[in-house]
């Protein structure tokens, strides 16, 4: 049960993406993302900022990169590296400004290490992340059709 409780499944327009969440690295972030998932917050939200060779960002209800859930999170920076498949929290200049937006790295992004909260890693479906349409902003963006915790699907 513990493994599925920390397994996030994103049904995207490009196919399913499974992220193993890491409460050992970022307990506050993982708990908040689970809350948002269970509230249906991420359902229908677009990948609004997608930079080739870098990352795909989602989690803004307006699709503008300016919105969120309204609940800021205290930074939980850790030593986990930003590499291909890393799931990390987006934020503004203030380290404690993470909210609902997160990104998945397409490739190594070590320049982010220790400055953004890593909270998980893609374990299945990275090929679907690779297919997400690029752009800033993205024209006709891909989206999260439905986000769910594996434990809730059982």
What are these regions (language model features)?
Residues 1-154:
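Cyclophilin-like peptidyl-prolyl cis-trans isomerases
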């Amino acid at each position: 049960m513990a493994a599925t409780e920390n397994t996030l499944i994103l049904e995207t327009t490009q196919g399913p993406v499974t992220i193993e969440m890491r409460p050992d690295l970022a307990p506050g972030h993982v708990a908040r993302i689970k809350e948002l998932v269970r509230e249906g917050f991420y359902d229908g939200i677009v990948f609004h900022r997608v930079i080739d060779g870098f990352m795909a960002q989602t989690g803004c209800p307006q699709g503008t990169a300016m919105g969120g859930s309204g609940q800021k999170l205290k930074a939980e920076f850790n030593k986990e590296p930003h590499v291909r498949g890393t799931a990390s929290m987006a934020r503004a200049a203030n380290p404690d400004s993470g909210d609902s937006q997160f990104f998945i790295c397409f490739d190594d992004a070590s320049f982010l290490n220790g400055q953004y909260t890593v909270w998980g890693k893609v374990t299945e479906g990275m090929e679907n992340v690779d297919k997400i349409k690029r752009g800033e902003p993205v024209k006709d963006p891909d989206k999260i059709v439905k986000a769910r915790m594996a434990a809730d699907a059982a």
